[in-house]
Amino acid sequence: MGIGFKGRKTLLRELVKYMVTLCISLVVLALLYIFINTIAMNTGFSHPANYNEREAEKLAPKLETIDKVTADMIPDTMSYAILNKETKQKTAGTIKEKDLQLVKKKIEKKPYVNYKQKGYLVIERNNEYCVLQYSLRADFSSPLLRKYLPNYELTSICILIILLIIVISIITTYFANRLRKHFETLNVITRYIKEQNLQFTPEFTHIKEFDDVIDSLIEMRDALQSSLEALWRLEKNKKEQIGALAHEIKIPITIIKGNAELLSLSMQNEEQAEYTKYILGAGNQIEQYIYQLIHLSKTEDALTIHLEKASVDELTETLVKDISAYKGNKNINISFKKENLMKEAKIDWQLLHRALLNILTNAVDYTPEGGTVSVHAECDSEIFYFFVKDTGNGFSEMGLKKATELFYMDDKSRHSKGHYGMGLTFAKNAVNLHNGELTLGNTIAGGAEVRVKIPLRNE
């Protein structure tokens, strides 16, 4: 398909653009750093690294000839020490003893290593040495800044590193957001396809690699749409054929039942009466089967929902009576729990009644003698909950996936005479027409559980 125009960008081009932008920004930042440092030096805001060394050299002649060196003669940017000429021991000063070891090696002209970028000037006096210690780093000219901040060199480097991190983060975030936007375009398209919402117009990114993926997704969408349309037509034809066949079968079944009923009224021996009873029973089963087929063939196409204000509580009460009658003499316990049922809500009473009754009759049929069917009906402000549990064999793994499909019968775990795989199918279709949700599961004890949630509307 393609977007059909020249000059589309590529990911490589975007990457090169990112690298060039980043490099230019870093170079500009470095030049700005140099410019600001130059301004700071020229305006006297900071002193160069050799400033203290020059000041010490200027001070040396005075300290060499003065009678006594005192602390007030030494600038606050320097430390000093007075050493005895013979013993090399400190007699006064502020230089730490550890640093004096380097000074002694320097006086004795022995090799030493200075790790701390400190300079030392040894001034020889009559009976002593005066040693000045100073920093070989650029520093602030302001005593206040020197007191509360590290030296100017370290402070400016820290600020530079912070600015580098900020610039890199801003540029990287900008380009990352541009790429994220393109990825989001892909996510939107894949989400539409996943939800089978295929009537959408794709938005291209104008980046070759992304647009190639979008082209592939569009081709997949078109193929999926064609497949779904073919499947829909096939399903529609199947339902039409099922409905037509069911109507055709009704006529001979009605004739069979009518003749069987006439036979039952005639003089028959016991064996003939038994056979006639079998014919009528089988005819009733087939008639019920056909009735369900006709309704299922209309569920999604012809069957419409008629919402009217009805009592949810009354619906539940009717279900209690109907399932109790359906149970008959079967030795099972039906536990019905009702909570906060709304007096009125807009529902299709007949449709919902039949759907929920299908679920209940399934539970009764699959529950063995002595078992229990538990029903919980409850409303909150927006949802009608209807949960049914039984103590039968539960759904198999395949049954959990396919039990609501037409004609599916889970023979391995929930086989029951008289079931044709249509009850849960109708229930699910009816729940869907109410914009509700029907889910299947198994209880911890191993029985089946059907959960229905119906959104309620009061208006």
From Swiss-Prot:
Modified residues (Phosphohistidine): 247
Keyword DNA-binding carried by entry: no
Presence of keyword Mitochondrion: no
Alphabetic keyword roster: ATP-binding, Cell membrane, Kinase, Membrane, Nucleotide-binding, Phosphoprotein, Transferase, Transmembrane, Transmembrane helix, Two-component regulatory system
Stretches in topological domain Extracellular: 40-155
Compartments where located: Cell membrane
Any GO MF annotation of the entry: phosphorelay sensor kinase activity
Matching Pfam families: HATPase_c, HisKA
Record GO cellular component, one term: plasma membrane
EC number: 2.7.13.3
Bilayer topology annotation: Multi-pass membrane protein
Ranges for domain Histidine kinase: 244-458
Annotated transmembrane regions: 19-39, 156-176
Chief localisation class: membrane
PANTHER family: HISTIDINE KINASE (PTHR45528:SF8), SENSOR HISTIDINE KINASE CPXA (PTHR45528)
Protein's job: Member of the two-component regulatory system SpaK/SpaR involved in the regulation of the biosynthesis of lantibiotic subtilin. SpaK may function as a membrane-associated protein kinase that phosphorylates SpaR in response to environmental signals.
Protein name: Sensor histidine kinase SpaK
Organism encoding this protein: Bacillus subtilis
